[in-house]
Structures are given as C-alpha cells and as structure tokens.
C-alpha cells in the first residue's frame, strides 16, 4: 500500500516539509517535492531518508502513464476529393467537421482561402 507523507523531523534539513509517497512493500520512497538533494519523481530506498518523523497526508493515487520522447500522429480519414467536393457543394456536407490547430471546426464555416489552405496542408504528394 502506498501512503503519502510530509516529513516533519529529520537530521537532513533538506527533507523538512518535503512530501513523499512511501511504498513499504517495495521499500521505496518517491519524492513529490523537496529542497536540495532530491528531485521530483526521484525514487530512493526508504533507508536513504535516514531517521525521520512524518505525518500521513491523504493521497489519491491513480495509475498514470508517463511518456517521454513520444510522437504525434495526425490521422485524416477524409480523401482530398471529399474536401474538394465540399468546397464546390457545401450543401452536401453541412456536418463535415475537421481539426485545425487542435480545434474542431465545421469545414463550411471556413473562408474559401482557409479551405484551400487546409486541403494544401493536409494532402501532400510526398514527404
């Protein structure tokens, strides 16, 4: 079981008022916030904290995924011809929604210049 603690007494002054997650089953402590010697998310053996007194603090531990060095993939499920037809016949595509800079927008609400720009940027002949 993981418990959250705030260190209230320690021979190491950098540990005073620091917050940790203690996993006694694994004998590990994860730093949440501390001064000086320890970094955020650093995992150390509980024994490395030395002689400390602490008070328990309520912790809501939810599993999280930490991704570093990931990649972004933009998937388009439209064909170029569909967007070109939407430019010529907007009445056929009143609900056509696209993503522009992370925002969802109705394709027909864009200006003709913006529509051409979306088509040009979205569909390229080569990489």
Swiss-Prot record:
The keyword Metal-binding does not apply. The keyword tRNA processing does not apply. The modification Glycine radical is found at residue 102. Residues 5-127 form the Glycine radical domain. Keywords: Organic radical. Pfam families: Gly_radical. GO terms for cellular component: cytosol. SUPFAM superfamilies: PFL-like glycyl radical enzymes. One of its GO terms (molecular function) is formate C-acetyltransferase activity. Transmembrane segments: none annotated. Acts as a radical domain for damaged PFL and possibly other radical proteins. This is Autonomous glycyl radical cofactor. It comes from Glaesserella parasuis serovar 5 (strain SH0165). The lineage of its organism: Bacteria, Pseudomonadati, Pseudomonadota, Gammaproteobacteria, Pasteurellales. The gene is grcA.
């Amino acid at each position: 079981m993981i418990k959250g603690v705030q260190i209230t007494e320690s021979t190491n002054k950098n540990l005073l008022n620091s917050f940790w997650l203690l996993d006694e089953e694994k004998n590990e402590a994860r730093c949440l916030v501390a001064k000086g010697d320890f970094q955020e998310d650093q995992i150390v053996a509980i024994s490395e904290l030395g002689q400390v007194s602490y008070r328990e603090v309520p912790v809501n531990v939810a599993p999280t995924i930490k991704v570093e060095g990931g990649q972004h993939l933009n998937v388009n499920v439209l064909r170029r011809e569909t967007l070109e037809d939407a430019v010529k016949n907007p009445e056929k595509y009143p609900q056509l929604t696209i993503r522009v800079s992370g925002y969802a927008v109705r394709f027909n609400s864009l200006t003709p210049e913006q529509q051409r720009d979306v088509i040009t940027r979205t569909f390229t002949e080569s990489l």
